[in-house]
UniProtKB/Swiss-Prot annotation:
Name of the molecule in the record: UPF0179 protein MTH_609
InterPro entries (alphabetical): UPF0179
Family affiliation: Belongs to the UPF0179 family.
HAMAP family in the cross-refs: UPF0179
Length: 147
């Protein structure tokens, strides 16, 4: 999908988390191209940076670049019984209140409860045991578009 991003951030292969539009964006003439295609709370991967520029008051008078993006693959921890490459799952956050070093992978940014996701790659066991006793696997998920 095509969107706009600050010139300093527009690098092929980089990723960004869309946190929602600034107040000034709501009435901007570029809003349909810039923010309308993006979902708040999603992580996007920049596939291509185009040679097109626009001025943007949000980026301190700097320019924004036209970029081609897609939803990024997200590294997560899931139950080992569901970790089959190529399968489509409904993502669920674990029922866990334990604060541990792996919590960011169990509750990752960019994927939401109930999202349909494809398991792109099974990365194997995490480096540590789950303190809550869950049998987990590290996987790369790709959130799928809603149908």
């Amino acid at each position: 999908m095509i969107t706009l991003i600050g010139e300093k951030l527009a690098r092929k292969g980089s990723m960004f988390l869309f946190c929602g539009p600034a107040e000034k964006c709501r009435d901007c003439r570029f809003q349909p191209t810039c923010i309308a295609p993006l979902e708040e709370g999603r992580v996007y991967h920049i596939n291509e940076v185009k040679d097109r520029y626009q001025r943007c008051p949000i980026h301190l008078g700097e320019r924004v670049r036209v970029v081609d993006v897609e939803k990024a693959n997200i590294e997560v921890l899931i139950d080992s019984k569901r970790a089959f490459e190529g399968s489509v799952i409904s993502f669920e956050f674990p029922d866990c209140d334990v604060e541990c070093s792996m919590r960011d992978l169990c509750f990752p940014e960019g994927v939401m409860e109930g999202d349909r996701c494809r398991i792109v790659k099974n990365l194997g066991k995490p480096g540590k045991q789950c303190p809550a006793g869950n049998e987990l696997r590290r996987v790369l998920l790709r959130p799928l578009d809603k149908k």
